[in-house]
Amino acid sequence: MSRLILASASAARRSLLQNAGLAFESLPVRIDEDAIRQSLITEGATPRDIADALAEFKARKATERAPGHLILASDQILALRGEIFAKPRDREDAARDLHRLSGHTHHLYSAAVIYEDAKPVWRGVGTARLSMHTHSEAQINAYLDQAWPDVSSSVGAYHAEGLGAQLFSRIEGDWFSVLGLPLLQVLSYLRMRGMVAP
C-alpha cells in the first residue's frame, strides 16, 4: 500500500496531520516559489490558481524522490485587494506588511495537491477571510517585539492560532486553511482511498 508523504517542512502542516491521526512521512522540497509566483502573477493568474500551482510544483518535485507513494503538497497565498503577499524578508518587511493589512480584510487561499505515479490525482483549495483591526505603528512594533522571529516564515507575519489572534476582529471560512492546509478536504479524499478510518 502507498505511504502518505507530506512534501513540506511546515511544522503547522505536520501538526495538523498528526493531530488528525494520519500516518505519514515528511519530505521537504525546495522550489523557487518567488520566481514561480511572480511568473504566474505576470500571466494574470488568480491567487487561488497561484496557490494550486505552487502546491503542484512541490508535489511534482517530491514525487521524483519518492515514486510509488501518495505525495501531499500544499501552499498558501495571501491576497489583499488583488495584491499577492510573500513571506516577509526581515522584520521591517513584516512591519510594512502588517501596516498594509491593518484595518482591512484579506483572503487566504490554501491549496493542496496529491500526486501518485507522477501525476495529480486530487486537488483542493480552502479559503478564509480575515479582518484585521486597525493598528498603529507602535502597536505593530509591540506585536513584533513578541512574535518575531517566530512569524518570519509566515505570509502576513502572523500566526492566527497564537499571539496573532489579537490582530483580528473577524475570521470567516475554513480555519484549517488559515493554518495552511485544507485539512477536511484532504481527509475526505484519503477516506475514499481507505487511509482514514470512517
Curated annotation (Swiss-Prot):
Localisation per UniProt entry: Cytoplasm
SUPFAM superfamilies tied to this protein: ITPase-like
EC number: 3.6.1.9
Substrates-to-products reaction catalysed: a ribonucleoside 5'-triphosphate + H2O = a ribonucleoside 5'-phosphate + diphosphate + H(+); a 2'-deoxyribonucleoside 5'-triphosphate + H2O = a 2'-deoxyribonucleoside 5'-phosphate + diphosphate + H(+)
Gene Ontology molecular function terms on file: nucleoside triphosphate diphosphatase activity
InterPro entries listed in its UniProt record: ITPase-like_fam, Maf-like
Family the UniProt entry places it in: Belongs to the Maf family.
Xref: PANTHER family: BIFUNCTIONAL DTTP/UTP PYROPHOSPHATASE/METHYLTRANSFERASE PROTEIN-RELATED, BIFUNCTIONAL DTTP_UTP PYROPHOSPHATASE_METHYLTRANSFERASE PROTEIN-RELATED
Name of the featured protein: Nucleoside triphosphate pyrophosphatase 1
Biological source species: Jannaschia sp. (strain CCS1)
